[in-house]
Each structure stands twice: as C-alpha cells, then as structure tokens.
C-alpha cells in the first residue's frame, strides 16, 4: 500500500494537480490538509471518476481535512477523543475545528460509512495517491488506521493559539496511548502538517526562528512525547529534505524551507514501511 500526505492549500484550486499526482505516483490513500471547504463544496465527483472514495471534514473556508482512498474507506471519525475546541475571538463559542479525520484504509476496509462525507468509487475506475511525505507499507491486504492531521499553527508564543496547539498535541498523545493499549498490533499512521520542526536541521536557519513558534522547546517536546507513546516518524531515515517553503520572499528557489510534514506510525505500521519520498516538483507549481 502506498500512503501519502499533502497540505493542498485549497482542494478546489488544485484538484487537477492532485488527481494528476495520484495517477503519476500510484499511491493508494492520500491524507489531505487545508482543503478549505465544506463537504458539499468538495470535488467528490472528480475523485470518484479517478477511482477514489473520499472522507471529508470541513466547517468553513478555513482548515479542513480529507482522506481519499482506492483501497476501501471505513470507520470514519471527524475528530479524535478529547480534541480541544477553539474560540476564534473573545466571546465567541469554542468549536472543535476541522483538523483531524480518521479512517481505516486497505484490507477489509469496505465501502465506507453511511455519511455524506464519503463518496464510493465508480466501478472499474483506476487511481492512486501521494504527496509531501509518505511511507509505503508492503502489503495492501492489511488495513491501516490512517489519520489526516492539521495541527494548529500556534501563531506566536504569547498567543492563546499557542497554548491551544500544545493542548491539541497533548490530547492526541493521550489518544495514541489509549489506541495502542487497546490494540498493540494496530497499524496506525498519523500523517499530516504538524506545524512543528522537531530538529534544528528541519529549518534552513535557526536564527530566523529565534523566539518563534514551530521550533520552541514545548512544541518539540510534544512531538517527542509521541515517540514515548509508541510512535515512530517513518520517513526521517529514508529521505532528507524540507516539506514546506513559504510562498513569500523566494523561499523555494533559495531552498529556505522547513520540515513540518510527517508520518508517525505504530510499530506495526513502521515494520511494513519500505520507502519514502518528498515530492519537491509539486511545490514548483502554483
């Protein structure tokens, strides 16, 4: 099975590029972040024509996550237990944002759940999936519990959004502990945009990030805690590169990037990984 993750930054804007990428890379399931649309606005028909069923979670034009699969899609969850809520402004009602989506792909995943967030594939259609950083478990016959995650940005170290980010990661850690305690042999993949650079070499110049989010000690400790909870980042030893380059200030041509997109896997998932890649070519487009 070929898994992948991609912060698509508007699925409606880039649907043609996404579908072309899926076909070219021949990947089975794609975790998408920043889809930036509600379920009824998602281009489901285009994915279905390519042979993918899609689970979608989006509340408005912000955030949004989705999973496209050609190997089955079942047990869809639009949040993880204990996922913190966020109030966009003072006095506003706090809501659980569209930042996490889980589904079982591969094996006997089946035809998905009975929800408008899932569209079954058309019979006989072919397809694939892929993106920024993804492992390749060897056997398509065994299911994987895949989560598409878009971790809060944090904004500034003194901003409430930063504390929200840390609380979000801590709640996720508790879920991982519980999931693996209930099923130690579960093939679990947490893929997405983590908005954290765990190591100094994951940014082009640490001096630029002095006193900023994404590289702070508490954020890095939060990701390290996932390892202690039983997860391994499965792409690190197989590929070295950045996964994100700001569109401003010619960051991409200068290779002034960050590595913030990762796939954290359980022991069962990590044992099946045979390779990984980061597709810089997709960043060359708009």
State where each predicted segment sits.
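Active-site environment of divalent metal-dependent phosphoester hydrolases
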Residues: 11-13, 37-40, 157, 197-198, ...
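Residue-level detector of structured alpha->beta connecting loops
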Residues: 26, 51, 72, 184, ...
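A long, amphipathic alpha-helix that forms part
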Residues: 162-184
């Amino acid at each position: 099975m070929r898994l992948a993750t991609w912060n698509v930054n508007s699925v409606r804007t880039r649907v043609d590029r996404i579908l072309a990428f899926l076909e070219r890379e021949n990947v089975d399931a794609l975790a998408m972040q920043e889809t930036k649309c509600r379920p009824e606005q998602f281009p489901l028909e285009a994915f279905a024509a390519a042979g993918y069923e899609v689970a979608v979670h989006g509340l408005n034009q912000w955030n949004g996550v989705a999973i496209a699969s050609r190997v089955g899609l079942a047990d869809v969850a639009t949040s993880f237990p204990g996922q913190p809520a966020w109030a966009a402004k003072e006095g506003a009602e706090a809501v659980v944002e569209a930042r996490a989506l889980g589904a079982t792909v591969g094996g006997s995943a089946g035809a998905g759940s009975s929800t408008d967030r899932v569209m079954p594939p058309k019979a006989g259609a072919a397809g694939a999936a892929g993106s920024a950083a993804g492992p390749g478990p060897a056997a398509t016959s065994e299911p994987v519990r895949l989560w598409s995650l878009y971790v809060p940005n944090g904004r500034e170290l003194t901003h409430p959004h930063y504390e929200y980010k840390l609380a979000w990661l801590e709640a996720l850690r508790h879920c991982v502990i519980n999931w693996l305690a209930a099923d130690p042999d579960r093939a679990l993949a947490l893929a997405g945009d983590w908005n954290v650079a765990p190591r100094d070499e994951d940014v082009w110049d640490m001096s630029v990030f002095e006193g900023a989010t994404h590289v702070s000690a508490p954020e890095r400790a939060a990701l390290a805690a996932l390892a202690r909870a039983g997860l391994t980042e499965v792409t690190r030893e197989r590929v070295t590169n950045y996964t994100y380059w700001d569109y401003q200030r010619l960051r991409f041509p200068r290779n002034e990037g960050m590595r913030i997109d990762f796939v954290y896997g359980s022991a069962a998932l990590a044992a099946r990984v045979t390779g990984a890649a980061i597709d810089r070519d997709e960043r060359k487009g708009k």
